[in-house]
Amino acid sequence: GLMATDGTIETGIYGRKAKSMKLAMVVPDKEHQAMVMEAIYGEKGVKAGFTDGHCKEVLLKAAEHLVRDKGAQALILGCTELPLILEETDNIKLGDGHAAIVDPTASLARRVVKVAGEITKIRGVR
């Protein structure tokens, strides 16, 4: 499942990549997408300096919706601010279900460091 801004979802960047890997990408319905946007841009959202309380509550409701209603097993935090609210984890309980939370920025950082390390070994540089 993907939790991101309306704009990020509309670009289809995550959906196309998932499809190329034969994975289904689900997104929140209109009501729950509004909650994601509220968690980001709302008066008590992360862009207003909040990382707990209301923004976390509504984001967790949207996450639970993706797991319960859409069958998501992993949730991508597709907005750079969302990992400030929810941490990356292999297993979070959401209602009666569970899912992994994926932080794309952290995943990218891990991959970049790994690739840089491999290049360094190949070139014999430290």
Predicted segments — roles?
Residues G1-R126:
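Non-catalytic structural scaffold of enzyme domains
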